[in-house]
């Protein structure tokens, strides 16, 4: 039988990036991988050794400045549903002709869930963030979702039901697959001991992305500042960072594609501002990370033992930031009313805290011991052999 696995991801860096080292590891073991996601991720997908199966990829890049509203977040869920509705006919036909043995899909992907169910392939859910079950849900702390979110979830359920799937889902808790690969270590997952053997907590694999991208580290540890790739249209935040850290040690600041560097004003001499940095390479040399607390960025920081100053921009990031603070791995700041003094004080605090340093060292060991891409590939192969 052809050793063929389909991967299906949402068209967002935080969802695609954690899966690519797993793809590369499976390719190294002789598997043929077809990867379903937006065409703009083609170069990264093909570099991992997979063949791209392109979709429309409708997820937006994020809203403009200002706090995210429930309507904006609901819009993201609606885009996931619309992308699945448009993509499923072509994707199903592609894999009818070229069936996979397994479908490894992002847990939020309707396309992946439907493809696994309708092809009869082994289903493997990929979770770039926390897992949830009836006993442990990090998202339960957020409270009852607003009506806009509930309406978007109902639309998801209707599409799943139209393909014959049992759509028992609610915000923050998705039906598990027969195998669920979670890209966080068990020590970071709330209530990890409440999950059964369908779950594998494998942590991240940032060392697979350590290409320096042309960046040369300075002679002393760098402060890294980034709000990720989606919710980063925050020029006021970046100007506050100029005020907080200008004139000090070296700073690497990633502002994304929507913020024009020229619009930020005078750039301090010690600050290197770019749309993008090779994040794992920078974190290897970082003293601290001022971050949006996206799970991918959080995991990469912990892999390298870097303390976090979390400035979350949306609900999922708030959950991650709260967990970081609970475990003594960094601090969480409220983005509303944030000042340069707040930022400077937070960075000074996390870099001087001996107890935090010890907690980071323990979590770095745990994160590296979780197994990463090798453990994920082992779990997928073992599941296919059952």
What are these regions (language model features)?
Residues 91, 168, 211-213:
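Short, charged beta->alpha transition segments
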Residues 1-149, 154, 236, 252-303, ...:
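Glycosyltransferase specificity loop/lid
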Residues 108, 184, 228:
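Anionic group-transfer/hydrolysis microenvironments
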Residues 189-288:
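Donor-nucleotide binding loops and adjacent catalytic segments primarily
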